[in-house]
């Protein structure tokens, strides 16, 4: 009999995200958008400080569906052959299957679980579809799991500062790894040394310009219009006139 799925995987699939936190109903920004893999529950930003030593996975929203960053998810489970999408230069993967209103058969690959049209060489449209495929075919998800003892939130995640101490604020402000764009070859990792698990993994493998914006001021425009820095007037009255210079009164076009 195959080993059951890990508890955090079931929680990631079953928990409801982007709903109000019942423990912080009156607080602002209380949407649950983090999954604690150790407690197997969803968290809001106000809950995060009490779980700061646990493995935390941020859940994002894309076209009204829950997604997770591919860089974070592949630390937990093999995500090869799962189609990823790009949001703000970060690759994300859908957590659950997405319903389709109509079936469209054309050229290309199709999802192994829901028949959704995919780009080559992908054969799964979501994490849930791959897990279902593996469980039905191999009865064991263990060969696809990866050992992950620490998982922190990204630097773009905002935690209410009034809930943190000075030491915690400094800890959360330390640099973390950034998103690496691009697909990398996935290595098989197994939590068990059983030969059957290695065989299942092998069988599956065979199947399948930084821009800086500056505020424009009247003085800068005046200096820029001069041919050289020597031509810029040093008279305070001229400088004041340049800074306070405004367009004339707008003229309305005559009515025909």
UniProtKB/Swiss-Prot annotation:
The keyword Nucleus is annotated on this UniProt entry: yes
Disruption phenotype: Small root meristem and low root growth rate.
InterPro entries, A to Z: PLATZ (IPR006734)
One Pfam family cited in the UniProt record for this chain: PLATZ
Keywords, sorted A to Z: Metal-binding, Nucleus, Zinc, Zinc-finger
GO terms of molecular function: zinc ion binding
Induction: Induced by RGF1 peptides.
Zinc finger (B box-type): 21-59
Keyword Nucleus: yes
Location(s), subcellular: Nucleus
Xref: PANTHER family: PLATZ TRANSCRIPTION FACTOR FAMILY PROTEIN, PROTEIN RGF1 INDUCIBLE TRANSCRIPTION FACTOR 1
Function: Probable transcription factor that plays a central role in mediating RGF1 hormone peptide signaling leading to the production of reactive oxygen species (ROS) in roots to modulate meristem size and root growth, probably via oxidative post-translational modification of the transcription factor PLETHORA (e.g. PLT1 and PLT2).
The name this protein goes by in its record: Protein RGF1 INDUCIBLE TRANSCRIPTION FACTOR 1
Species for this entry: Arabidopsis thaliana (Mouse-ear cress)
């Amino acid at each position: 009999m195959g080993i059951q799925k890990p508890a955090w995987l079931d929680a990631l699939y079953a928990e409801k995200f982007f709903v109000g936190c019942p423990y912080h109903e009156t607080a602002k920004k209380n949407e649950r958008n983090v999954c604690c893999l150790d407690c197997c529950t969803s968290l809001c930003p106000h809950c995060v400080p009490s779980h700061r030593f646990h493995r935390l996975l941020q859940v994002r929203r894309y076209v009204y569906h829950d997604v997770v960053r591919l860089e974070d998810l592949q630390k937990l489970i093999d995500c090869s052959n799962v189609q990823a999408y790009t949001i703000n230069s970060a690759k994300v993967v859908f957590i659950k299957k997405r319903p389709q209103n109509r079936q469209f058969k054309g050229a290309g690959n199709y999802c192994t679980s829901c028949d959704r049209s995919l780009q080559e060489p992908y054969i799964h449209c979501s994490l849930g579809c791959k897990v279902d495929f593996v469980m039905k075919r191999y009865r064991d998800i263990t060969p696809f799991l990866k050992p992950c003892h620490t998982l922190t939130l990204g630097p773009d995640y905002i935690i209410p500062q009034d809930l943190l101490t000075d030491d915690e604020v400094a800890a959360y402000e330390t640099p973390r790894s950034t998103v690496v764009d691009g697909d990398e070859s996935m290595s098989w990792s197994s939590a068990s040394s059983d030969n059957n698990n290695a065989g299942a993994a092998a069988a599956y493998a065979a199947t399948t310009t930084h821009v800086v914006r500056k505020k424009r001021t009247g003085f800068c425009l005046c200096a820029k219009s001069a041919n050289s820095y020597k031509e810029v007037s040093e008279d305070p009255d001229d400088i004041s006139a340049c800074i306070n210079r405004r367009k004339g009164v707008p003229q309305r076009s005559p009515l025909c």
